[in-house]
């Protein structure tokens, strides 16, 4: 990294710091229905099956992908 990089970044972000930032006032209503234990279990299981299971399979078979046939 160059010595000038921090100076360049400071120059680019300096003008953005002076802009007024409006404060967001976000309010929401309470939920219509409380989530039950079964709903949470189904949600966590579906996240595991959709995201973690395929990535775990790819990572466990990584050596097979590296080999040239």
Swiss-Prot record:
Pathway: Energy metabolism; oxidative phosphorylation. It is a single-pass membrane protein. Component of the cytochrome c oxidase, the last enzyme in the mitochondrial electron transport chain which drives oxidative phosphorylation. The respiratory chain contains 3 multisubunit complexes succinate dehydrogenase (complex II, CII), ubiquinol-cytochrome c oxidoreductase (cytochrome b-c1 complex, complex III, CIII) and cytochrome c oxidase (complex IV, CIV), that cooperate to transfer electrons derived from NADH and succinate to molecular oxygen, creating an electrochemical gradient over the inner membrane that drives transmembrane transport and the ATP synthase. GO terms for biological process: mitochondrial electron transport, cytochrome c to oxygen. In response to mitochondrial stress, the precursor protein is ubiquitinated by the SIFI complex in the cytoplasm before mitochondrial import, leading to its degradation. Within the SIFI complex, UBR4 initiates ubiquitin chain that are further elongated or branched by KCMF1. Keywords: Membrane, Mitochondrion, Mitochondrion inner membrane, Transit peptide, Transmembrane, Transmembrane helix, Ubl conjugation. Component of the cytochrome c oxidase (complex IV, CIV), a multisubunit enzyme composed of 14 subunits. The complex is composed of a catalytic core of 3 subunits MT-CO1, MT-CO2 and MT-CO3, encoded in the mitochondrial DNA, and 11 supernumerary subunits COX4I, COX5A, COX5B, COX6A, COX6B, COX6C, COX7A, COX7B, COX7C, COX8 and NDUFA4, which are encoded in the nuclear genome. The keyword Iron-sulfur does not apply. A motif (SIFI-degron) lies at residues 2-19. GO terms for cellular component: mitochondrial inner membrane; respiratory chain complex IV. It is found in: Mitochondrion inner membrane. The chain crosses the membrane at residues 37-60. This is Cytochrome c oxidase subunit 8A, mitochondrial. Belongs to the cytochrome c oxidase VIII family. Residues 61-69 are mitochondrial intermembrane.
């Amino acid at each position: 990294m160059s010595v000038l990089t921090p100076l360049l970044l400071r120059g680019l972000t300096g003008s953005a710091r002076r802009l007024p930032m409006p404060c967001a006032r976000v309010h929401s209503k309470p939920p219509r229905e409380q989530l039950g234990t079964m709903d949470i279990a189904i949600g966590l299981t579906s996240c595991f099956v959709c995201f973690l299971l395929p990535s775990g399979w790819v990572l466990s078979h990584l050596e097979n992908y590296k080999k040239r046939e």
